[in-house]
Amino acid sequence: MSATVTFSVDTAQGPRDVSVVHRRAGSGDPVLLLHGIGHHHQAWDPVFSILAAERDVIAVDLPGFGASPALPDGFAYDLAGFVPVLGALCAALDIERPHVVGNSLGGLLALEMGREKLVRTVTALSPAGFWTQAERRYAFGTLLAMHRGASLLPRPAIERMSRSAAGRTALTSTIYARPWRRSPEAVVAETLALRESTGFHETLAAGRTVQLRDAFAMDTDAVPVTVAWGTRDRLLLRRQGVRAKHTLPGARLVRLPGCGHVPMNDDPALVARVILDATA
């Protein structure tokens, strides 16, 4: 069951209320799960129960995505806007320095939370930001095409396509290496989440200036970092994982054989094991 938490975040214009939808289960060390751009917390469903058997797991809809409302006026959809909100969210949920796991945009946010020492460990699955400008333009163009396609398709067409493996492949093969494994209901829900995400365009625009290279200094002794990359990632190409390792030499780099950009669907057991090992 999902729940909504509302909390206050300080801004230059005074405190503002932010609401975040999340799913929480399990017990033990807290693990915060952050999805990618245009997705929702259900991206973590394939691994959620496995993780919740050993951890206190909180999967969130980032503001402006999934069922969470947009950020209030005056907030930017960039690192400087998102990270204080996530810090305030942790305080509202009474979790102090959780382990954080993020995919794509969520991985970028997780790394920034780690850089600011807001978390115990960081596990970043195909994190955004380790691209060249050409790779970024390719990824953003692909994301815009996905968003446009989801916006143009009537809901009955999405539901009809999702009933077949071929249709699910057409809708989601950019992010999944094994799109047929995703249930029809999940594909419908995430396609609708993509087109209805109020923060999509502002987040994408903010990402144009992000490039995590030598200037991204992070103490990986104080906050251990694991970076994992699918060998069949078609959105953020796997060579970006090698670049991440060069940028963060203290990080652990893990290959996810046969996995795409959102690896939780492609190999839930492997991804869960990587997360549990990283948060032990």
Would you name each region that the model predicts?
Residues 1-31, 52-56, 95-96, 279-280:
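Alpha/beta-hydrolase fold catalytic core
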Residues 21-69:
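Conserved HGGG/HGGXW glycine-rich cap/lid loop of the alpha/beta-hydrolase fold
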Residues 80-98:
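Conserved acidic catalytic loop of the alpha/beta-hydrolase fold
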Residues 119-155:
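Flexible "cap/lid" loop of the alpha/beta hydrolase fold
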Residues 158-220:
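Conserved alpha/beta-hydrolase catalytic His-Asp/Glu region
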Residues 221, 227-229:
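Short beta-strand/loop motif that positions the catalytic acidic residue
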Residues 232-236:
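Acidic catalytic loop of the alpha/beta-hydrolase fold
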Residues 259-272:
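Catalytic histidine-centered segment of alpha/beta-hydrolase-like enzymes
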